[in-house]
């Protein structure tokens, strides 16, 4: 396929491109059409657009780009690209201040998060969702299952399969770029879950709602049973399906168990069905997991799901650190992305405790960006190591302004420097005149150094 694809690549100017009739980014890629989104991504990543086309056609890269999201600045997720990060926000029953959530949106955009997921789960969410899509250049994701109860003002068990599908279409019409759909939790997976006891059962919010719906109605998962209808909707609007992991582990005890792996196998089968319809796929993954299991899990996903992009929550590597789960998550995320994860969902210090505030959100974004960048260095992503090398040069030269400009959080770096002023400017208050960098620079230049005298010679 690769060779035939290379032979079929051809380019169109903008006028000619607009005449082309393609349904999705994957459809365009298979036909050798260069979309404006592909051009944007090639420029951002600094790679040949031919490589983007090849990977999108195979499914190893996804471009979440709803036809109705007009403010989108497209990003690619997958093989050979920078590791992307997602920020979760949204309205809950206990915290339903729309303006406060919109402030979080602005913060996420300012901090250059590539994706924002609206996880609103209370009331009529469409107004907030539409405002989010209108103002955001970041790709937008949702979980339609969360919205169903408020959308219909019905109890969960009374919502029909058709109504659940209608919620998906509503989100698609609104311009959502990717949707988490828990299509892998079928009746077979439910029976495996029942036979294999867990410490923490099902911790996925959408997965638990879907499990409850299936049990209360004694029916098959509607997203699995009617997956072709889901594909119809996603093909129409070019929505990327983020196949949700309802059985992701909620504790390190439950990781890599029968329920998790069974669902992952089903997600692989659904991936092939989606690609046959030119619908793009991202696979969602764990979760809570000990360090020694992460590499294996990344390789399993790539094998069982045919190298589809992998989107992970953490993984959180220990369960004992509430208030610090941005750290437990960043540790796991760096390892996961090194071994194949393409997309990291941020975790904040508020995880497991409350809805995050703006400060929590910033801490979570920075921690996740550090994890993503560390993995990109290890993976050899273009430009990743150069950023660190520039910082090292600035440190050697004791160029504080350059260091601040290069810092992943320059605001915090400037604040720390300002709050603790050294005796001499070419040092900091940790070492003062004993600064190794300062003294080596002087000696290497043939100069004398002093530690006790007030002035240098």
UniProtKB/Swiss-Prot annotation:
Cofactor note: Binds 1 [4Fe-4S] cluster per subunit. The cluster is coordinated with 3 cysteines and an exchangeable S-adenosyl-L-methionine.
Keyword set, alphabetical order: 4Fe-4S, Iron, Iron-sulfur, Lyase, Metal-binding, S-adenosyl-L-methionine, Thiamine biosynthesis, Zinc
Transmembrane feature ranges: none
Pathway: Cofactor biosynthesis; thiamine diphosphate biosynthesis
Residues noted as binding Zn(2+) in the record, renumbered to the chain: 288, 352
Top-level EC class: lyase
GO biological process: thiamine biosynthetic process; thiamine diphosphate biosynthetic process
Residues reported in the UniProt entry to bind [4Fe-4S] cluster: 428, 431, 435
Sites where the protein binds substrate: 88, 117, 146, 182, 204-206, 245-248, 284, 311
Gene3D superfamilies: 6.10.250.620, Radical SAM ThiC family, central domain (3.20.20.540)
Protein name: Phosphomethylpyrimidine synthase
Species name: Clostridium tetani (strain Massachusetts / E88)
Lineage, top ranks: Bacteria, Bacillati, Bacillota, Clostridia, Eubacteriales
């Amino acid at each position: 396929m690769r060779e035939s694809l290379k032979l079929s690549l051809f380019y169109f100017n903008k006028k000619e491109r607009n005449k082309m009739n393609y349904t999705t980014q994957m459809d365009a890629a298979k036909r050798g059409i260069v979309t404006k989104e592909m051009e944007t991504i090639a420029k951002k990543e600094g790679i040949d657009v031919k490589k983007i086309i090849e990977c999108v056609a195979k499914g190893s890269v996804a471009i979440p780009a709803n036809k109705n999201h007009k403010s989108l600045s497209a990003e690619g997720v997958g093989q050979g690209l920078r590791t992307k990060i997602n920020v979760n926000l949204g309205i809950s029953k206990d915290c339903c201040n729309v303006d406060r959530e919109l402030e979080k949106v602005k913060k996420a955009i300012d901090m250059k998060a590539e994706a924002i997921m609206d996880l609103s789960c209370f009331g009529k969410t469409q107004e907030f969702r539409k405002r989010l899509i209108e103002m955001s250049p970041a790709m937008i994701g949702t979980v339609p299952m969360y919205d169903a109860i408020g959308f219909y003002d019905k109890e969960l068990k009374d919502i029909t399969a058709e109504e659940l599908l209608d919620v998906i279409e509503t989100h698609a019409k609104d311009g959502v770029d990717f949707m988490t759909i828990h299509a892998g939790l079928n009746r077979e997976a439910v029976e495996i879950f029942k036979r294999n006891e867990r410490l923490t059962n099902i911790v996925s919010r959408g997965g638990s709602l879907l499990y409850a719906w299936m049990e209360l109605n004694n029916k098959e998962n509607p997203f699995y049973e009617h997956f072709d209808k889901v594909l119809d909707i996603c093909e129409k609007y070019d929505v990327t399906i983020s196949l949700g992991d309802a059985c992701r582990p909620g504790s390190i005890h439950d990781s890599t168990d029968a329920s998790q792996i069974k669902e992952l196998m089903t997600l692989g089968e659904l991936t092939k069905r989606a690609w046959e319809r030119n619908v793009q796929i991202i696979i969602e993954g764990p979760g809570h997991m000990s360090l020694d299991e992460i590499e294996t899990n990344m390789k399993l996903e790539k094998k069982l799901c045919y190298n589809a992009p992998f989107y992970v929550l953490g993984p959180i590597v220990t369960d004992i650190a509430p208030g610090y789960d941005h750290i437990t998550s960043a540790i796991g995320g760096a390892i996961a992305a090194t071994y194949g994860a393409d997309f990291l969902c941020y975790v904040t210090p508020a995880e497991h405790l409350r809805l995050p505030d703006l400060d929590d959100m910033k801490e979570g974004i920075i921690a996740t960006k550090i994890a993503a960048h560390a993995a990109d260095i290890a993976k050899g992503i273009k430009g990743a190591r150069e950023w660190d090398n520039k910082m090292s040069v600035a440190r050697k030269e004791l160029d504080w302004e350059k260091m601040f400009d290069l810092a992943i959080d320059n605001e915090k770096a400037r604040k720390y420097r300002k709050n603790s002023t050294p005796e001499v400017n070419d040092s900091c208050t940790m070492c003062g005149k004993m600064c190794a960098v300062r003294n080596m620079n002087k000696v290497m230049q043939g100069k004398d150094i002093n530690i006790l005298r007030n002035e240098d010679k």
